[in-house]
Amino acid sequence: MGSGKSTAGKRLAAHCGYAFVDMDKLFETKHNCSIESYFEQFGEDSFRKEEALLLRETASLENTVIATGGGTPCFYDNMDWMLPHGICVYIEMPPKALYNRLINSKSERPLLQTHCNASLLEKIQNLLSQREQYYQKANITISGLDVEIEKLSMLICQNIYEK
């Protein structure tokens, strides 16, 4: 949810010589529609079920960096499934920093688009509060605050090789 997972993931994959998969893009390709459209047509529950199935389809991939959606770890035991299948990285960001990143792209994010700017920060705080218990299970936690993407991807790479 705006922490830079996809951008950092692409850089990380390049540094490691790995392939890169963005789960949101994979979902949109498989379902031939945007996540926003899917939410509108089928709702969040259906989206989360399909997302969990798609995540499990990535099990056969090797040497691949996978950027999940922000909610992916929080449903259908996805985080517990991801942990033995790879190294999970949580890019930690404070709510206000996420707000500043998301304020101009909230229309592309189904869980945020109905919120006016005044209530957006509160929604982000609530989502983080609900999701934190899952994010904290990650193998690696790195602050994404005030760090250039190139530096962030290098920090993640260093942490992975230390594991």
Question: What residues fall within each predicted segment?
Answer:
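ATP-binding Walker
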Residues: 3
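Walker A/P-loop
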Residues: 6
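Post-Walker A helix-loop "phosphate-sensing" segment adjacent to the P-loop in P-loop NTPases
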Residues: 14-25
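NTP-dependent small-molecule kinase module
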Residues: 15, 129-163
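ATP-dependent small-molecule kinase phosphotransfer cores
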Residues: 23-83, 108
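Short glycine-rich anion-binding loops that position phosphate/pyrophosphate groups of nucleotides
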Residues: 70-72, 94-96, 147
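A glycine- and Lys/Arg-enriched "phosphate-lid" helix/loop adjacent to the NTP-binding pocket
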Residues: 85-130
